[in-house]
Amino acid sequence: MQVLPPGSTGGPSRLFILRPVATTLLMAAILLAGIIGYRFLPVAALPEVDYPTIQVVTLYPGASPDVMTSAVTAPLERQFGQMSGLKQMSSQSSGGASVVTLQFQLTLPLDVAEQEVQAAINAATNLLPSDLPNPPIYSKVNPADPPIMTLAVTSNAMPMTQVEDMVETRVAQKISQVSGVGLVTLAGGQRPAVRVKLNAQAVAALGLTSETVRTAITGANVNSAKGSLDGPERAVTLSANDQMQSADEYRRLIIAYQNGAPVRLGDVATVEQGAENSWLGAWANQAPAIVMNVQRQPGANIIATADSIRQMLPQLTESLPKSVKVTVLSDRTTNIRASVRDTQFELMLAIALVVMIIYLFLRNIPATIIPGVAVPLSLIGTFAVMVFLDFSINNLTLMALTIATGFVVDDAIVVIENISRYIEKGEKPLAAALKGAGEIGFTIISLTFSLIAVLIPLLFMGDIVGRLFREFAVTLAVAILISAVVSLTLTPMMCARMLSQQSLRKQNRFSRACERMFDRVIASYGRGLAKVLNHPWLTLSVAFATLLLSVMLWIVIPKGFFPVQDNGIIQGTLQAPQSSSYASMAQRQRQVAERILQDPAVQSLTTFVGVDGANPTLNSARLQINLKPLDARDDRVQQVISRLQTAVATIPGVALYLQPTQDLTIDTQVSRTQYQFTLQATTLDALSHWVPKLQNALQSLPQLSEVSSDWQDRGLAAWVNVDRDSASRLGISMADVDNALYNAFGQRLISTIYTQANQYRVVLEHNTASTPGLAALETIRLTSRDGGTVPLSAIARIEQRFAPLSINHLDQFPVTTFSFNVPEGYSLGDAVQAILDTEKTLALPADITTQFQGSTLAFQAALGSTVWLIVAAVVAMYIVLGVLYESFIHPITILSTLPTAGVGALLALIIAGSELDIIAIIGIILLIGIVKKNAIMMIDFALAAEREQGMSPRDAIFQACLLRFRPILMTTLAALLGALPLMLSTGVGAELRRPLGIAMVGGLLVSQVLTLFTTPVIYLLFDRLSLYVKSRFPRHKEEA
């Protein structure tokens, strides 16, 4: 595209100035498209950047962590490891549960990943234990992603088993069908079952064994095909009373005969209706409850999903008895909506402040209306493009539009100011519009494309950070582009019809006072600039010192990854001694819950104890603390966490780890604290040697707090050491021993009761109430070759040992995850460096590897690419400016203003006590685009004066600085006030917005002062350099 030079009559704006109706209709079309687009845009907390993640859960009640690892997890991992597109595979194998989490590359569609996972499970089926109660179940959900909604179902009249049955069949299934729902889990799921508790003494007295009982039950309760009779006239279906449905029927079941008399199950066992797993429990505000956690699919629209669930709830609750109460304990969308509302308010406030600044400078209602129309038009038109690109209304896109407020008004200000200058000189409005727009058209194009060039590197950022800021960068670029179009079309057309000498000269007392103030400021600036031009080397020294100071501040400033948000929900892990039982954990959680609910900021609490897909070991409990709305509590979430941990610290035998939930979830497992670091080895023995050493070293670091690990190798285990020779002589196999132990202590699911709506289990176990602990093993009896029974103690010796409570793998190798927080006064960058230094000090062997995980790993990657990102932005700007100016020298002059922005931004962050995180870095990159606009406006007019008026470079730059001082000040203040609401934000999600505002306001304040003086000096320096090069190399005809 050939750009018309300054001074032409109208340039690209001529057609639009002369055709006001067409221009008006074109702008109306943009406005209408934007309004329609806004109605179709979904609302979210952040852009969708989730990794495709699938969780595979396999439950095998009674199996030890060793058995789960070797028999279940390892076969699955071998198949999963062959899948293409797999980024990371982690697993947890604990008592009775195996959880494998598969994280795929961002580019792999979730549906494709799902198909590969299903195929891998099918391939591993033959390698899994034949008596698994259920096959592996996969869910399209990230287990570390907090639930979008938590519901508690309670009843003061019904047992939890009946409540759970109704919730599972009437509520959970329906919610699972909602589009966007990835998984509905029932914490504390007390599924109904018939529990058979054998009396070991009674069984032994009759010469029976638990295996005899199990065989009798499984043979008496079947549900299989029986065929049909097909006669000449009628067909008859065969059925029988082969199913037993109630505990009473099982109680009357004959399991053997003694001396001709029947022995019924009720004679040797307590048979009752109970729960399938008696070691699971959940509480809502200390009341027993079934807690429903609803998690979304990766990439699903969280707002739409939550709205669909809420619309469905009234109908679902009507199907439940009156005594059953369903309560929404938490809804993440409440805070998301509040955060978006606050950001929308800050956007409107930014628009109002920008318009106010325009009026302050122009002091003219018609001249203020013109940019007052251009700004919302540019922003609203952006919504149409956002819909086309499948974007959403989220915190980042709204932040982009808020920042764009200061950007988009710049173009209108530059056009209006230039046209007004000619009208004030006596030219007709139409002629002034043609001349002023033509003169400034090239400047607008330069400003626009050089600013968009700054955003280009953001589009090429890799991994999740790049995905996160793609919507931000594109939204801002589109708003700037539409603004340029509006400023070259609608703005000059409105100036030609709304501005006049009378309106511009019409002044009141306030206008005259402002004019005198601006005249004095410009005069003072002119005197200061003359002195600076007379002492160029001093000014250059200041510019060089600014560059050095920028580098120094960059090195020393604390660095972080992503601001910690206050979303009103706290996730917690309660840790107890490794040998803790379910009963002791239930008691501990009651004590902890009582302390937590006493805090004035807490609204509700859910706790869960037991082993399932979310909680790996019995000595840990999961908590979710829901806080009151931000405006209803005095403290932020970190203060509440500190207070809760202090309150619980006096309870003996527990450690409470708390962290606020975040909108951005990168981890694949629920951790105790915010940051993770892994230690991986080829064997468990190697891990057991190095874990204590590394943990002790990390705990001694002042840069880390709350250091813990998931390494638990001190769980109590009873080792049954069988004398194989003695067992063989008696005709007892190891399978017989395993079956006897499993029957007694594994809550073994031995049979299934089928109904029209659901299936229920028959659970076999020993009644250990009279013989607790290891003494229960002495009651185990086995059938010998001659049909008699033999006590287990006759062929085995019982030893008490320590064993792992869980075995964790990362990409099929044993791993331990260290969790830590960063104490006040230190940054994540400090903690990462301290860990790396500690690793070097310990001199780990080659077969031991370490790696950061989750947000810490993303922080490392982002930190390594940040400098290159800024360099890429500068290079992109240089290329664009070089093309526009057809010069190698002038772009360097423009870019020389950038260090001043860096100094201001970094100083502001340090003074405000903020870290240099990803949000602040984006602010610095945007500053690069804003600050150079000052230089562009100066240099454009200086070059035009040299070319058209024959002025010397010094006179030309001096005149350009004075002429462009007012629009430079206006545009800078507009950008500053566009960012000011973000800096001062205090509502929901303010932690996310504030670093961007602080960086931009600080950078603009410092750069505005310095660039007004350094740019003309550097311009003259490079002009002399250009003349020197031409004199030394006269054959080179390139224009510098």
UniProtKB/Swiss-Prot annotation:
Q: Show the GO MF annotations.
A: xenobiotic transmembrane transporter activity
Tell me the InterPro entries matching this sequence: AcrB_DN_DC_subdom (IPR027463), Acrflvin-R (IPR001036), Multidrug-R_MdtB (IPR022831)
User: Gene3D superfamilies recorded for this chain?
Assistant: Multidrug efflux transporter AcrB pore domain, Multidrug efflux transporter AcrB pore domain like, Multidrug efflux transporter AcrB TolC docking domain, DN and DC subdomains, Multidrug efflux transporter AcrB transmembrane domain
One Pfam match, by short name? ACR_tran
Would I find Transmembrane among this entry's keywords? yes
GO CC annotations on file: plasma membrane
Topologically, how does it sit relative to the membrane?
A: Multi-pass membrane protein
- Which keywords label this protein? Cell inner membrane, Cell membrane, Membrane, Transmembrane, Transmembrane helix, Transport
Subcellular location field: Cell inner membrane
Q: Which residues cross the membrane?
A: 25-45, 347-367, 369-389, 396-416, 440-460, 472-492, 537-557, 863-883, 888-908, 910-930, 968-988, 998-1018
Q: Oligomeric state and partners?
A: Part of a tripartite efflux system composed of MdtA, MdtB and MdtC. MdtB forms a heteromultimer with MdtC.
By sequence similarity, the record places it as follows: Belongs to the resistance-nodulation-cell division (RND) (TC 2.A.6) family. MdtB subfamily.
Any idea what this protein is called?
Multidrug resistance protein MdtB
What gene is it encoded by? mdtB
